[in-house]
């Protein structure tokens, strides 16, 4: 449980930093920025899950690939399916992360469901968004809520293992 909480909090901080960069630099939503954002975010997630297996570098590499593929999938599918495809992509990255975490696919599915619901619940955090106010604290808490079910599912180990 401790690893799940630490992971969710760390990656929530990375996501909040990403929100700050997008807002603080007034970045327009361009494919190259989205690809970079997804790659860096999932590089961090992969590194964390990899570190739990003492394969940090490989986890980071796989995580970066997952993030790039996820962001690329979003940008390919969004013009056809709309922005709601973001929920679909978000859900399926957890199955890929199960591989990085060394977790069974079933736990990837549980992570997909739990974190998918969490992401759906927090998905309105950008509207309205006040980058000068307390919104970053709300973003951090919201991201923690969205990530925690996935981290719980993927980092849980039965007693004695």
Residues of each region from the PLM?
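Juxtamembrane/disordered regions of integral membrane proteins
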Residues: 1-161
């Amino acid at each position: 449980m401790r690893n799940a909480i630490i992971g969710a909090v760390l990656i929530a901080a990375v996501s909040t930093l990403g929100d700050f960069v997008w807002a603080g630099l007034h970045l327009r939503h361009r494919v190259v920025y989205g690809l970079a954002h997804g790659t860096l975010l999932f590089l961090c997630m992969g590194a964390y899950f990899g570190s739990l297996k003492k394969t940090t570098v490989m986890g980071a590499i796989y995580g970066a690939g997952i993030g790039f593929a996820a962001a690329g999938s979003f940008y390919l599918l969004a013009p056809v399916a709309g922005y709601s495809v973001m929920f679909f992509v978000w859900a399926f990255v957890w199955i890929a992360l199960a591989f990085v975490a060394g977790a069974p696919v079933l736990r990837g599915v549980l992570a997909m469901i739990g974190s998918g619901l969490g992401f759906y619940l927090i998905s309105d955090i950008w509207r309205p968004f006040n980058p000068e106010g307390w919104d970053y604290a709300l973003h951090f808490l919201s991201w923690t809520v969205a990530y925690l079910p996935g981290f719980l599912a993927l980092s849980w180990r039965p007693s004695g293992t």
